[in-house]
From Swiss-Prot:
Keywords carried by this UniProt record: Ribonucleoprotein, Ribosomal protein, RNA-binding, rRNA-binding
Organism: Mesomycoplasma hyopneumoniae (strain J / ATCC 25934 / NCTC 10110) (Mycoplasma hyopneumoniae)
Quaternary structure and partners: Part of the ribosomal stalk of the 50S ribosomal subunit. The N-terminus interacts with L11 and the large rRNA to form the base of the stalk. The C-terminus forms an elongated spine to which L12 dimers bind in a sequential fashion forming a multimeric L10(L12)X complex.
Record's protein name: Large ribosomal subunit protein uL10
GO terms, molecular function: large ribosomal subunit rRNA binding
């Protein structure tokens, strides 16, 4: 009987130490999520239930090539970090297996990549997220994915400014060729 009492304190001490290490790791993960939420320009939450490992790896490769950080976190830990940063409305989207895509360089890139892949893989569901420090719904995230990226917008602007000048130059060249005006 005394033997069982002498083993018990050792067992509970070891178990308590293991639980403390798990708790420390969870605190570190919440701090990591906090940092990502503060430093990233956008966040898209994706449900990936039913995807194969190869499909998920391909999605992650696309994210990486676009400068998007993608990670899987426990929803409970993400809820804690979201509450710490004032994103209480995200809690409704934190159900099921979720992949969190943080836009670091281009704010629209996560939503664009997910929308493109969702056409090929219907099991990929774009949920809500954060854009411009505002919580957005799945519908708003879909609208954001339709927006042009920064470089695409600049290209559209440049071509819009260039088009009238090209038409003027072409018209003047035709008039010169027909010799209605002299150069």
């Amino acid at each position: 009987m005394n033997v069982s009492f002498s083993i018990a304190p050792y067992f509970f001490k070891e178990r308590r130490a293991k639980l403390n290490s798990f708790r420390k790791r969870k605190v570190e993960i919440v701090a990591e999520i906090d940092s990502l939420l503060k430093n990233s320009s956008s966040l898209a939450i994706v449900e990936y239930r039913g995807l194969t490992v190869n499909e998920l790896e391909q999605l992650r490769k696309e994210f990486k090539s676009a400068g998007v950080l993608s990670k899987v976190y426990k929803n409970r830990l993400f809820k804690i970090a979201a509450e710490n940063n004032g994103y209480l409305d995200l809690q409704t989207d934190l159900v099921g297996p979720n992949l969190f895509a943080f836009g670091t360089t281009d704010a629209i890139a996560p939503a664009k990549i997910i929308a493109k892949n969702a056409k090929e893989q219907p099991l990929l569901i774009l949920k809500g997220g954060i854009y411009d420090n505002q919580v957005v719904s799945a519908a708003e995230n879909a609208l954001i994915s339709a927006l042009p990226s920064y470089t695409e917008a600049l290209t559209m602007l440049a071509s819009g400014l260039q088009s009238p000048l090209k038409q003027l130059a072409f018209g003047l060249k035709l008039l010169i060729d027909e010799q209605k005006i002299t150069a």
